[in-house]
Structures are given as C-alpha cells and as structure tokens.
Amino acid sequence: MDNREDSKVVIIGAGFGALTAVKTLRKNGFSDSITLIAPKPIFTYIPSAIWIPSGLRKREDLEIPLDNFFKRLNVEYFKGSVTGLDSENNSVKTDNGDVSYDRLMIASGGRFIQKLPGIKENVIIPCDGISAGEELRDRLAKMDGGTIALGFGGNPKEPAAMRGGPVFEFVYGLDTLLRREGRRDKFKLIFFSPAPEPGKKLGPKAVAGLLKEMKKRNIETHLGNKIKEFTTDSIVTEGGEFKSDLTLFMPGMTGPMWLAKSGLPLSAGGMVVADSGARVPGFKNIYIAGDSGSFPGPEWLPKQAHMADLQAEAGIKNMLSDIAGTPAEHKFKVELICIVDSLNTGVLVYRDVKRAIILKCRIFHW
C-alpha cells in the first residue's frame, strides 16, 4: 500500500488485541514502522490458566516469548510501562522514556477493581496472571478438606466490564479434579455472586443450564447479595456471612491507571470511550481494542480475547484507511464465543445479535 509520512504506528500492549493489530497491519501491506510497548516481550495465554491447578498446563506452556514474532513481522519492541499520554504532541509516556507516534493503537488491557475490604489480602483473582493459577494449585494441594468459594462481580458503572466465564470453568474444573483425586467428599464448593442471574451475558438458557449443572454436582450457591467484605476464612454479604477456607473471586474491571492522565474521554466505568469502528471520538489518530475500551453494543458485549481481536482488526483497518485518505467505515462484529471447560467435557456458548447457541459436548476438550 502507499504509506504517507504520518504512518509511524505505536501499539500499547502485548495481549490478544495488540498482536492482532500487528498481524492485521502487515497482512494488509503496511510496511512502515511499528513499535510495540509492553513491560515484557511475552504473550501470556491467560485462558488456559484454568488448567494450571490440574497440572495440564504450567507457566512455561502459557508464557510465549515474542522475539521471533517481532523479528518476523519487523516490529520494534520498547520495554516500558505506560504512565500517561500527551495526545497534543503525539507521545506516549512510559517509565522508560517517551515514545512518539503518528497513529496509536491502545490494546493495553484493563485491570480488576480491588476496592472491597479484604480482597487484596484474602482473595485469589483467577485471571490476574499465571501466579494466581499457581497459588490456587499450591494451596489446593495442601488442603485436606474445607470450603472453597468461587465467584465474580462487575463494575456497577460499566455493566459490560466483567469476566465471569472463567469462574464457571474453575468451579466445574475443581469439582472434576477433586472427584478424580477421590476427595470431593471432603470439600464444600460454593458459587457466589452479587448478581441474581450470574452469567447473563451468555444468555438466559445458559444461566439456567449452568446453575442446574451446579446443583447436579452438589455445588452450593449464594446469589443476589452485595458483597461487603472478604475475611481470612469467610465472605460477608448483605445476605449473611458464609465460611470460605479458599476464596477465588473475579471482580469487575476498569481501565488501566494511566488513563487518568491521558486526556482521553473516559466512560463512567473508567474506560476509554470508543465507537463501533474502534476509534476514540475526537482523536483522529487514536484507536483502541479490548478491555481498556468502552464500546457501543448490546448489554452482553463480552470482555474476552476474541472480542479484542475483532476490535483490533476493525480499528487497524480504519487506521489504514485514514492513512490512505479513504473512507474509514469498518465496524467490528459483535459476538461471544465461550467454551466452558470442566476438564473432561465442555459447553460451547455462542451468541451474536441474531442468535444464541448452547452445545454440550466433548469435541472441544483437549
């Protein structure tokens, strides 16, 4: 393609959206400079962290060095953590210096809200990194029995900013693992959520099916009560307190801390406001994909890797149109694809604006 001078692209992040952005640029003939900013040149495959407690995956299986990827696609890696943005001067601020850009793709991911009392001290956040999966594995191995509570919440100011699917996988996966080990009878499993219908994004039929499966597996539920506190051995809610020797909780999400100094338009939930083309309104050279963005769409719009990929692809195609001076009319497809894995079987959930499909089978299990 015919690149103009204003085509130095900078990408923030090293996750799904960021890597899809790189691939989409090169696939569509972009041959100019690409710089990717991230703390480490590593892609972490968080979706498979559900298999760490069972030993099916280890850290080295899920942390993929990006050196060859960068070399193959001619990407300059810049080591740093973003601290702010100077959009007037087209500069990204990091703890390792500033990086200038002509076009910017933000794919830095979000962060979990950790404001509830006791959440930092007494809770494992399953998708907060590989270390969380390892901590769960190690603590579970040391337990002779007890109560394990697993749940998720949301961002009250940003309904779409939640990630509940992996918690269902941990619930069913732990049940299966403990049965395999012959010690399920020594443990009580509790699924909890402040939402009366947790997992509603997956569709009403999916929620009913997931809760029915819990009952079948003798997994207790504690639903519809606002959480007040996590203690060392219990969870306190407005509906009462229940014991927990090991607590896994996925809180709602918000944007990264540096957004407060970015000058970008933020939603009530703390994420960058974006349009259906993954562009930031009012900023002609800034695009966004994934968990750090607040996108238009149905209430079930997912915060998941697949959606980040779709947003990155649309955003980059619009970026390339802007560079070429042609109409930028690309919009990301809205769809949810989730395979709820339970170690020995799985449930496929698919949803788009026209349909919702649920399929229970073994075909997707490795």
Regions found by a protein language model. Name each.
Residues 43-46, 113-116, 257-258, 295-296:
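Short acidic/His/Gly/Ser-rich catalytic and metal-binding motifs that mark active-site loops
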Residues 120-145, 234, 241-246, 250-310:
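FAD-site-proximal beta/loop scaffold in flavoenzymes
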Residues 29, 314-366:
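C-terminal, flexible cofactor-proximal segment of oxidoreductases
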